[in-house]
Regions:
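Single-pass membrane-anchoring alpha-helices
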Residues: 13-48
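Intrinsically disordered cytoplasmic terminal tails of membrane proteins
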Residues: 1-15
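Kelch-like beta-propeller repeat domains
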Residues: 38-425
Length: 425
């Protein structure tokens, strides 16, 4: 029998061609429909984007700064955390020591120096404590020449090494609550020595350092039995033999806070009202002074009005902590001497403030300084009231705090949420 291999039949010329054409036509139609749908989707997406852009009705993220024409908030609003550390003590931590109306200044090696203030017995202090941030221990150093409270303090650095050479302590009030213009240097190795006296009263004023000079600003001056906030500014250089009067602040400020950052001087908050109307007296303004031109510029205000706060310079920003605020009674009247938990960070390049984690213990009239570990706050007064009259908030004696808290903030991307300026968050 003859063997023939199997041969695959050829497709019919008619049937195979029709199928091929039908498949090609169907593929082309599907491709065209896909193209049309894709083009429509792109068109609609662009139209939606343009409409949303025009209406600014949606938030979006940017890196580094808020887009021009928009308002914004840090994606890390409320960042940071506060932690209790060793309370203020004069005997190695055995007994806590409440104190208010003091100043804290960072020395070399990160240690913080606490000057003067008022204790729980109402005594105005000449005390100097050194806080070791590593061992968390307080050491009693040589006292100041004179007791003082509600004064200014700032560091002068060495022109050759950049290290703290001396700390200037100036102004404030004495043991009788009288305004004083005396000043002294505090050498970290040898203790105090006389410094040139101020030209003006600066009770409850604020001091900032640029390293090569310190600036004493604002505060109160006494006229008879009345006190008036002042706008005076004085400068003492590292080699100066007298305070030099500089351009006044844009407006008077008592109970202000100040810090030096990258060669500029900043003054935040404070109080100014001749009638002591607390509904308008507390301020949230921020003023920047340029030593190179002897001029002041008003910058973006804080989000919260307050006085007797602290302003601390970080690496590139400023941290405004705590302070005294107005508070309404049930009948609608306002009182002061009420401490706040507010914490805000200022970004000079953006001219913008952002909320940070609130401090655990509300306080005002406290000391604050930055170390290598974080931002420290020491002592201060809480919400004050007369124990015999719950509606009288003018009584603070004996309520001074020994509390010491430290603020830590992890580094994070500089991400900002942008939104329509008409919507406030």
């Amino acid at each position: 029998m003859e063997f023939r291999p199997y041969v695959t039949p050829e497709r019919g010329a008619c049937g195979g061609g029709v199928a091929r054409v039908a498949l090609l036509s169907l593929g082309g139609a599907l491709g065209f429909i896909t193209f049309v749908l894709a083009a429509y989707a792109v068109s609609e997406t662009r139209a939606m984007r343009d409409e949303m852009e025009a209406n600014r009705a949606y938030p979006f993220l940017t890196l580094g700064r808020v887009k021009a024409g928009y308002a914004g908030a840090s994606a890390y609003r409320g960042a940071g955390s506060w932690h209790e550390q060793k309370p203020v003590s004069t005997d190695g931590g055995v007994t806590e020591s409440g104190v208010s109306d003091l100043q804290a200044v960072t020395g070399n090696h990160g240690n913080v120096y606490l000057f003067g203030g008022i204790d729980t017995a109402g005594n105005v202090l000449d005390r100097v404590l050194e806080y070791d941030v590593i061992r968390q221990m307080y050491y009693t150093n040589t006292s100041l020449i004179a007791a003082r409270a509600r004064f200014g303090a700032g560091a002068l650095t060495s022109a050759s090494t950049g290290l703290v050479d001396r700390i200037v302590v100036a102004g404030g009030v004495d043991s009788s609550q009288n305004a004083i213009t005396t000043a002294e240097y505090y050498d970290l190795s040898t203790g105090p020595s006389a410094a040139p006296g101020l030209n003006h009263d600066h009770a409850d004023g604020c001091m900032a350092s640029t390293g090569d000079a310190v600036y004493m600003m604002g505060g109160w001056r006494a006229v008879g039995y009345d006190w008036f906030s002042v706008s005076k500014v004085e400068k003492l250089t590292r080699t100066g033999t007298a305070w030099e009067t500089m351009a006044d602040m844009p407006s008077p400020r008592g109970d202000c806070a100040a810090a030096g950052l990258k060669g500029k001087v900043y003054v935040a908050g404070g109080y100014d009202d001749a009638t002591f109307n607390h509904t308008v007296g507390f301020k949230k303004n921020l003023y920047m002074y340029d030593p190179a031109t002897n001029t002041w510029t008003e910058k973006a205000p804080m989000k919260h009005e307050r006085g007797d706060l602290q302003l601390v310079a970080l690496d590139d920003t400023l941290l405004a902590i705590g302070g005294e605020i107005k508070q309404a009674r049930p009948d609608g009247s306002h009182v002061n001497i009420v401490a706040s938990h507010y914490v805000e960070e200022y970004f000079p390049e953006k001219d913008q403030w952002e909320e940070r984690a609130y401090i655990g213990n509300a306080r005002f009239r406290f000391g604050a300084a930055k170390s290598d570990w974080g931002t420290h706050v020491f002592g201060g007064s809480p919400v004050c009231k007369d124990p015999l009259d719950p509606n009288d908030y003018s009584y603070c004696d004996g309520l001074q705090m020994s509390s010491h808290e430290v603020y830590f903030e992890l580094s994070h991307p500089d991400v900002w949420v942008n939104y329509d300026a008409a919507h406030e968050f």
